[in-house]
């Protein structure tokens, strides 16, 4: 397993995490190919981190899998924009750290799948309701109580 860490990228971590979730568990070669056609700014940085992690381990891109791709928040650059009446509003420019781990792909032997049999359907039984108690109307009940 090899790692690559790119620090202080001028990119919002929430936007980069959307792309990082897409490539987790993918083959590294396939992940880099799919990131190449994504229009997002973070796709370029994540593809760079994946290729760096593959090179750090001395692997070929087609024989490794992206085990994890994590995007953490880094320091936030704070800038000010002048506003009306001498005030100013704060502008936040977030940065992020990208950590990519790649590992050798495990080749799984084809195992014979056993299909679980369905349980037999339950027999339908008809239930009869107990007869409801007869209720007397309220006018009749109050008339009987008074007399």
Swiss-Prot record:
The family database entries (SUPFAM superfamilies) matched by this protein are listed as: Ribosomal protein L22 (SSF54843)
Asked if Phosphoprotein is a keyword of the record, the answer is no
Statement: the UniProt record of this protein carries the keyword Metal-binding: no
Query: Low complexity: which segments have biased composition?
Result: 117-140
The protein's GO terms of the molecular function aspect are: rRNA binding; structural constituent of ribosome
> Which InterPro entries does the UniProt entry name for this protein?
Ribosomal_uL22, Ribosomal_uL22_bac/chlpt-type, Ribosomal_uL22_bac/org-type, Ribosomal_uL22_CS, Ribosomal_uL22_sf
Q: Name one Pfam family in it.
A: Ribosomal_L22
The record lists its disulfide bonds as none
> So which domain of life are we looking at?
Bacteria
List UniProt keywords, sorted A-Z: Ribonucleoprotein, Ribosomal protein, RNA-binding, rRNA-binding
Q: How is this protein organized at the quaternary level?
A: Part of the 50S ribosomal subunit.
Q: What does this protein do?
A: This protein binds specifically to 23S rRNA; its binding is stimulated by other ribosomal proteins, e.g. L4, L17, and L20. It is important during the early stages of 50S assembly. It makes multiple contacts with different domains of the 23S rRNA in the assembled 50S subunit and ribosome.
Family of this protein: Belongs to the universal ribosomal protein uL22 family.
Per its UniProt record, what NCBIfam families does this chain match?
rplV_bact (TIGR01044)
The protein in question is named Large ribosomal subunit protein uL22
> From which source organism is this entry?
Campylobacter jejuni subsp. jejuni serotype O:23/36 (strain 81-176)
């Amino acid at each position: 397993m090899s790692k690559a860490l790119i620090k202080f990228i001028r990119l919002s971590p929430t936007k980069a995490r959307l792309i990082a979730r897409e490539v987790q568990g993918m083959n590294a070669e396939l992940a880099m190919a799919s990131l190449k056609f994504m229009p997002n700014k973070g796709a370029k940085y994540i593809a760079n981190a994946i290729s760096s992690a593959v090179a750090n381990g001395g692997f070929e891109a087609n024989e490794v899998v992206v085990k994890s791709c994590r995007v953490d928040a880094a320091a936030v650059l704070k800038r000010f924009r002048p506003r009306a009446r001498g005030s100013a509003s704060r502008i936040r420019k977030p940065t992020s750290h990208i950590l990519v781990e790649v590992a050798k792909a495990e080749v799984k032997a084809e195992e014979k799948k056993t299909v679980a049999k369905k349980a037999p359907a339950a027999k339908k039984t008809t239930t009869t309701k107990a007869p409801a108690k007869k209720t007397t109307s309220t006018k009749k009940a109050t008339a009987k109580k008074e007399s």
